């Protein structure tokens, strides 16, 4: 729309019979920006944050995020671009908005020798101002900020670092931080991946109150090599405890957990497995599970991709009540 691989975002509304686009395409700034690599909507759908990890606003591939508001006529940018710190940061690779759209968390997984960081900004009706310091990854090559998910009020943020080595090379981990009106303080310990090579934390989703977090580990081999899994944890005011057993992918190579999305209260989770072959090679699928206070039980059948090579489940998003699911297929 604005040059080769500039990228764009389209927003659609359901009118009880069909999906109708709201406003025009929201185009990336320039060629090769890959705008739309990440996207997050406010709860009422009137504000959207869009990541463009390859944007060059602060150096080659520094990345940026733009936030737009719907004024009943068009999408208007709120404030200026939120640029990455430095060249090569790929800031905007992940993004998450608070429910009212006034706070945004932005992942830059390649910052500072691939340790990665997350920055959180608040809208003051004039500009986007950073809240607290950068939330840096633990070590070089952690890729912290590859995924990010924020509580409804923006006070708690879960950050995935899929390449962290806390439980073996590239086992991955998630850290959860809370804003105490002065700084971002980690809640509990690291939530480490199960084993080396799991890349746990490449996807993450947190409940609206920040007390439940779902973590994808698509290379976990609990049900065959790279079957993938999702683990769900609950905060008990002192530590993170796993809810139920691992939710394993169906078969080897499924890469289940590449995408994950929780219902607002954390009781339902949608899981994307774009490598699944249920409707042809790499057709992909999504499974939805509900917590029954004892275990995670699948709701309904697999939601299979339309055809071979669709890689359906590459992205997934649940509505707040868990009754609707949006599924991306490459």
State what each model feature region is.
Residues 1-330:
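Conserved beta-strand/short-helix segments
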């Amino acid at each position: 729309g604005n040059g080769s691989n500039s990228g764009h975002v389209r927003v659609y509304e359901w009118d009880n019979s069909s999906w109708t686009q709201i406003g025009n395409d929201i185009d990336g700034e320039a060629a090769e920006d890959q705008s739309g690599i990440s996207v997050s909507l406010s709860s009422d759908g009137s504000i959207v944050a869009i990541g463009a990890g390859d944007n060059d606003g602060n150096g080659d591939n520094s990345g940026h995020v733009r936030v737009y508001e719907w004024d009943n006529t068009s999408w208007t940018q709120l404030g200026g671009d939120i640029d990455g710190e430095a060249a090569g940061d790929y800031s905007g690779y992940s993004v998450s908005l608070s429910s009212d759209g006034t706070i945004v968390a932005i992942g830059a997984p390649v910052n500072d020798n691939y340790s990665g960081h997350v920055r959180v900004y608040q809208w003051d009706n004039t500009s986007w101002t950073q809240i607290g310091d950068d939330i840096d990854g633990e070590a070089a090559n952690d890729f912290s900020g590859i995924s990010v998910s924020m509580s409804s009020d923006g006070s708690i943020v879960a950050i995935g670092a899929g390449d962290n080595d806390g439980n073996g090379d590239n086992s991955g981990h998630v850290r959860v931080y809370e804003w105490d009106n002065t700084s971002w303080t980690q809640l509990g310990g690291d939530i480490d991946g199960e084993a080396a090579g799991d890349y746990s934390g490449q996807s993450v989703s947190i409940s609206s109150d920040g007390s439940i977090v779902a973590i994808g580990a698509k290379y976990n081999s609990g049900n065959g090599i790279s079957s993938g899994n999702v683990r769900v944890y609950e905060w008990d005011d002192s530590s993170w405890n796993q809810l139920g057993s691992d939710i394993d992918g169906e078969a080897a190579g499924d890469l289940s957990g590449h995408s994950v999305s929780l219902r607002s209260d954390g009781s339902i989770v949608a899981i994307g497995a774009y490598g699944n072959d249920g409707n042809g090679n790499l057709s992909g699928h999504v499974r939805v599970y509900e917590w029954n206070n004892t275990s995670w039980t699948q709701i309904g059948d697999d939601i299979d991709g339309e055809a071979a090579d669709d890689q359906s489940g590459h992205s997934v998003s649940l509505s707040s009540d868990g009754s609707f699911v949006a599924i991306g297929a490459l």
